[in-house]
């Protein structure tokens, strides 16, 4: 991969492009036609989507060696996104431990055995077109749900982070209102389309989740995910700036592995298990094309995709494990890509 463990380009390139690009977007560079503005919105949405990828790395605490730096960086990003760092981390820990099962908070409702096909189809639309609201709801469930698995310490941290989000956004709204009332800022000149890149970035994140998991029946971390590993430069550059998250099977099996080790982890697994067909795709487009039928035919994972509810991690997990899973059996191999229409 580009630079392996070198992090700084990820934190410099897309934030810089996004900030400079926003200036161009707001000032009308390229014209003010609807098509030009939509192109700007999609481009900037992708930039912010890449920037938000660092939130995922902070949750895993794999950006450098400082735990505190990861935590506070994650809290800053989470405050901006409206998703408390601790909510995301606790939900994501269980996503790795209980992937594609009923205990997987991140893949609700697609993993819930009792969720109707109609509800899951409707939620797909919400996950894409209302992603800016869907993401905080899905991640926040672990805090608000009855019989929440969160410890009291985690609940206290979540409460404080929700308060910080409310204060941050409340201050911005109040400040803009005061500036407007005093004639310093004319909100009538504000174009709501300038906000469009944000929900588009959230939609990119929702579709990324689908590409990684939707339609996958197996609960084995390697076989129950789609992995993208290509040789063309477009795929590899996109992978680099998304912290190699598309090498998703190894990421799920080795949650504590730094992103730049995932390709070698996959090669090691393939060498040990030459007879197992792993869902590896050469391009993002190939993975997306495999996902698209699942969006409507049967948007589900695990039981809802024809698999089982079997887990490979003990109950009550409270942190990422070093390695999740087992030696893939012929049964798991057989259901890895099976879907139910």
PLM features: residue spans?
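Cytosolic juxtamembrane regulatory segments of multi-pass membrane proteins
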Residues: 226-244
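Membrane-cytosol interface motif
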Residues: 71-80, 219-232
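Short acidic-hydrophobic sequence patches enriched in Asp/Glu that either
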Residues: 64-72, 84-87, 199, 261
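Aspartate-rich (DDxxD/NDxxD/DxxxD) Mg2+/diphosphate-binding motifs
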Residues: 53-72, 100-110
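Non-catalytic, topology-defining segments of multipass membrane proteins
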Residues: 1-47, 79-191, 195, 259-341
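Histidine-centered catalytic micro-motifs
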Residues: 52-60, 88-100, 208-216, 241-257
């Amino acid at each position: 991969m580009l630079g392996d463990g070198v992090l700084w380009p990820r934190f410099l390139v897309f934030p810089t492009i996004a900030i400079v690009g926003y200036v161009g977007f707001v000032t009308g560079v390229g014209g003010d036609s609807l098509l030009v503005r939509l192109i700007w919105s999609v481009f900037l949405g992708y930039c912010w989507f890449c920037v938000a990828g660092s939130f995922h790395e902070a949750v895993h605490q794999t950006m450098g060696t400082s735990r505190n730096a990861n935590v506070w960086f994650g809290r800053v990003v989470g405050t901006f996104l409206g998703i408390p760092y601790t909510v995301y981390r606790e939900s994501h820990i269980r996503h790795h431990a209980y992937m594609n099962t009923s205990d997987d908070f991140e893949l609700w409702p697609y993993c819930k055995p009792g969720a109707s096909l109609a509800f899951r189809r409707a939620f797909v639309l919400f996950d894409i077109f209302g992603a800016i609201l869907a993401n905080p709801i899905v991640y926040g469930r672990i805090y608000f749900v009855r019989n929440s698995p969160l410890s009291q310490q985690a609940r206290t941290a979540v409460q404080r982070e929700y308060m910080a989000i409310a204060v941050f956004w409340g201050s911005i709204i109040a400040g803009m209102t005061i500036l407007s009332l005093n004639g310093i800022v004319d909100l009538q000149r504000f174009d709501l389309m300038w906000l469009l890149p944000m929900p588009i970035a959230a939609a990119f994140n929702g579709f990324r989740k689908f590409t990684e998991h939707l339609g996958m029946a197996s609960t084995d971390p390697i076989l129950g995910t789609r992995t993208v590993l290509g040789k063309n430069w477009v795929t590899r550059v996109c992978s680099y700036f998304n912290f190699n998250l598309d090498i998703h099977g190894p990421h799920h099996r080795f949650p504590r592995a730094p992103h730049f080790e995932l390709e070698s982890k996959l090669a090691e697994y393939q060498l040990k298990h030459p007879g197992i067909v792993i869902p590896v795709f050469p391009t993002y487009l190939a993975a997306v094309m495999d996902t698209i039928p699942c969006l409507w035919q049967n948007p589900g994972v695990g039981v809802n995709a024809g698999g089982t509810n079997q887990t490979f991690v003990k109950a009550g997990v409270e942190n990422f494990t070093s390695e999740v899973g087992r030696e893939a059996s012929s049964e798991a191999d057989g259901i890895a890509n099976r879907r139910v229409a």
